[in-house]
Amino acid sequence: MQYSEIMIRYGELSTKKKNRMRFINKLKNNMEHVLSIYPDVSVKTDRDRGHVYLNGTDYHEVAESLKEIFGIQAFSPSFKVEKNVDTLVKAVQEIMTSVYKDGMTFKITAKRSDHSFELDSRALNHTLGDAVFSVLPNIKAQMKQPDINLKVEIRDEAAYISYENIRGAGGLPVGTSGKGMLMLSGGIDSPVAGYLALKRGVDIEAVHFASPPYTSPGALKKAHALTRKLTKFGGNIQFIEVPFTEIQEEIKEKAPEAYLMTLTRRFMMRITDRIRENRNGLVIINGESLGQVASQTLESMQAINAVTATPIIRPVVTMDKLEIIDIAQKIDTFDISIQPFEDCCTIFAPDRPKTNPKIKNTEQYEKRMDVEGLVERAVAGIMVTTIQPQADSDDVDDLIDDLL
């Protein structure tokens, strides 16, 4: 027998009573975006559960995609069969004989939404249970925590049988918590920060600073590849490339070396905040981890934050590097992140950056520059690209080819 659909059980949105349908509609939209790589698959949702119709598509590939989508608590692949007792008996016997192993226990859980069906739920439980005993006489029934819980649902159009319950990603559907601007470098931390923001329902737009010719086309391609990895959790992501060469050259020329990183980050924060304002974002998200590098001390964060009143979310701020790497490997961004392309934060990195910069000093150095003009020109020059989910490709090999 071949699976015909996958039944979706919702996650935390079950607690969002007043906004429930808004959350469900957003989840449906996200599933459609992520599953768009399977042209024959369709999605339907109602108040209690969702349904992914396979229409001949390989179940295992679709299931792997569903495991990543936030807002799904669990899902079950289902067999669609004709709605009569004889057909149900044969289907249940075939399924049970294929999955049963010595010593396993079972339970039949029948449910009717079509009350015109000839047997009620209790009678159907008994009939199908007897059918299992007739082909597996040594099997034992167990009502609490059986090894196999065979669920039979009688709907208006057909009957559906399932026995697997696969854990989903949980969290909230992406987009239900508003929009945030992710400051995406090419490193390990910022994609992980983006992933964790997505899990809490934030619709992220990736802001990436490029400084050609100091940063290469390969660095930009790397940032695109990292963004594409994040699309599998909720669908399309807007990638915003910011021209940053003029600003970095200006900072290099007019500020002391120890303050290069602080001033660079302050400009990045200003620009990201301006983009957020123009694109109706609510927060800024970055991959800062406390004490990991010179620009991530509390004093540095304070000096950098001083340029905006917008909330800054730092999902990995308390994590050790190994904890961040574990998540990066889980979400398949690590091997891309470690490819050796320089980004804006490394090309002019000073040997001894200031770890406790003073706000008054940074402001004094910025008076040597046309801060507003530099920010305006950078924002005016942004390029926005829609990054879409796609079938698995070897992004790492592509990046290595660029290096060679």
UniProtKB/Swiss-Prot annotation:
It catalyses: [ThiI sulfur-carrier protein]-S-sulfanyl-L-cysteine + a uridine in tRNA + 2 reduced [2Fe-2S]-[ferredoxin] + ATP + H(+) = [ThiI sulfur-carrier protein]-L-cysteine + a 4-thiouridine in tRNA + 2 oxidized [2Fe-2S]-[ferredoxin] + AMP + diphosphate; [ThiS sulfur-carrier protein]-C-terminal Gly-Gly-AMP + S-sulfanyl-L-cysteinyl-[cysteine desulfurase] + AH2 = [ThiS sulfur-carrier protein]-C-terminal-Gly-aminoethanethioate + L-cysteinyl-[cysteine desulfurase] + A + AMP + 2 H(+). Pathway: Cofactor biosynthesis; thiamine diphosphate biosynthesis. GO terms for molecular function: ATP binding; CCA tRNA nucleotidyltransferase activity; tRNA binding; tRNA-uracil-4 sulfurtransferase activity. Residues 60-165 form the THUMP domain. It is found in: Cytoplasm. Keywords: ATP-binding, Cytoplasm, Nucleotide-binding, RNA-binding, Thiamine biosynthesis, Transferase, tRNA-binding. Coiled coil: none annotated. GO terms for cellular component: cytosol. HAMAP family: ThiI (MF_00021). This is Probable tRNA sulfurtransferase. It comes from Streptococcus agalactiae serotype Ia (strain ATCC 27591 / A909 / CDC SS700).
